[in-house]
Amino acid sequence: MSKVSNGGGDSKNTLYCSFCGKSQHEVRKLIAGPTVFICDECVELCMDIIREENKSSMVKSREGVPTPQEIMAVLDDYVIGQKDAKRVLSVAVHNHYKRLAHQSKNSDIELAKSNILLVGPTGCGKTYLAQTLARIIDVPFIMADATTLTEAGYVGEDVENIILKLLQAADYNVERAQRGIVYIDEVDKISRKSDNPSITRDVSGEGVQQALLKIMEGTVASVPPQGGRKHPQQEFLQVDTTNILFICGGAFASLDRIISARGEKTSIGFGATVKSVDERRIGEVFKELEPEDLLKFGLIPEFVGRLPVIATLEDLDVDALVQILTEPKNALVKQYQRLFDMENVELVFHDDALRAIANKVVEHKTGARGLRSIMEKILLDTMFELPTLEGVREVVISGDVVDGSARPLYIYAERQDEKGNVSA
C-alpha cells in the first residue's frame, strides 16, 4: 500500500511508490492506480523482467520450430509436385525461425536474414506455397501485389502500407507482426523498364525496388494506424522489419529466353547439343537460373542481393493437374463432392473427365488456378437444377461432358409406390 505523509516539507501530502517505497520527490514520475502508486523506475524494471522472460521462453520453444522434414510433409499434403521448390522453402523457413528462436543467445556471429524468391510460370503454386508455410509456422501472413506499389509521394500504394496490413493481420500485436511472413506477388512486373536510365522517373518499376530494399533488409517503419498517407499530426506505430520473412514471387515471362541465350553461349563447339527454348519446358529452363539472369531481366543488383534463396517451380503437366484435382486434402473434386453431398447427391468424375479438364488448363496455359473456372462451367447447370430435382442420388461427369458434347448423367434413387412396385 502506498504511504502518505502529513509531515512538513514542500507539500503537506507526500506520495510514495507502493513497490520500492521511494517518494514522489525521488522519482521522475509516479503513476496512480486504485489505492496504489508505481514509479517510472519500477515500470522500467517490470519491462526488463518481461523482456527477459519473453527471450527465455523463445529459447525454450526450440521444439516449436518445425524441422525441414516436418514442413515438407505438410506441404506435400496440400501442394502437388514442386519437390525441389518445397525442399528449398522448407530449409529456408526452418533456418529463419530457428535464427529467431536463438537470437537471445550471446554470440559473436550475427545470422543474416535470407528472404526468398519464387520463380515459376502462372498457376504453378507460388502463392499457395507461401500461404501454406505461414499456416504451418502459425505466424501472421499477408499478400501484396507489386503492381499496385509506387514510391512514397506518388499516386498508388506506399511500400510501408505492406507493413500496416501485416500489423492488421496480427491484430495490431507489434511483436507478432515482427515475426510474420510477407508475400509480394508479381515482382517481375516492377523490373526496370529499360537498361538505360531515363530522365522520366520510373516510380512503379525501379523506384519500387528501391523502396522495398529497406523494409526487406530491416528497418524501423513508421506506420500510420489508419493507413493511407502520412500526416504530421498523426501518431505512428514503430515496426521493426528485421525479422519479417519476405517471399517474392513472379512468373518472369521471357526470363527463360535470357537463361537459354546464356546457355547457348557456353555450349558452342563440336558435339555440343543445344535445345531451343520451344523444345524445353519452362520449369526445366528455370532450374538453370543464375542471379545475372535476373539482372538482365531488369531487377537491380541490390534487390537481387536481398533475395539470396531462389526456388524455381515447374510448369504443371496433365498428370500433375489431375493429381491436384483429386489428391490434396482440400482438392477441388473433394470440395465439389462435399457441396453435392449437402444435397444428398454423390458426384462422380470419370478418369477421362479429369484428364479432359487438365488438358483444357494446359491448352489455356492458366495453371492450377484455371481448374476451378473450368469445374464451375461444367457443373453450373447441374448446381442450378439440382436443388429442385427430387430423387437424384448420383451425378456422373464423363469426358464428353467436359468437351461439351454431352450432359451430366443423373441417376435417380428407386422409389416404391403404395403397392410396393419399384420404379426408377
UniProtKB/Swiss-Prot annotation:
Protein name, per record: ATP-dependent Clp protease ATP-binding subunit ClpX
Keyword Translocase: no
Functional summary from the UniProt entry: ATP-dependent specificity component of the Clp protease. It directs the protease to specific substrates. Can perform chaperone functions in the absence of ClpP.
Native species: Brucella canis (strain ATCC 23365 / NCTC 10854 / RM-666)
Gene Ontology MF annotations: ATP binding; ATP hydrolysis activity; ATP-dependent protein folding chaperone; protein dimerization activity; unfolded protein binding; zinc ion binding
Family: Belongs to the ClpX chaperone family.
One GO biological process term: cell division
Pfam families: AAA_2, ClpB_D2-small, zf-C4_ClpX
Single GO cellular component term: HslUV protease complex
Keywords, comma-separated and alphabetical: ATP-binding, Chaperone, Metal-binding, Nucleotide-binding, Zinc
Xref: InterPro entries: AAA+_ATPase, ATP-dep_Clp_protease_ClpX, ATPase_AAA_core, Clp_ATPase_C, Clp_protease_ATP-bd_su_ClpX, ClpX_bact, P-loop_NTPase, Znf_CppX_C4
Chain ranges of the ClpX-type ZB domain: 5-58
UniProt superkingdom: Bacteria
Residue numbers binding Zn(2+): 17, 20, 39, 42
Assembly notes: Component of the ClpX-ClpP complex. Forms a hexameric ring that, in the presence of ATP, binds to fourteen ClpP subunits assembled into a disk-like structure with a central cavity, resembling the structure of eukaryotic proteasomes.
Residues engaged in binding ATP: 121-128
SMART domains according to UniProt: AAA (SM00382), ClpB_D2-small (SM01086), zf-C4_ClpX (SM00994)
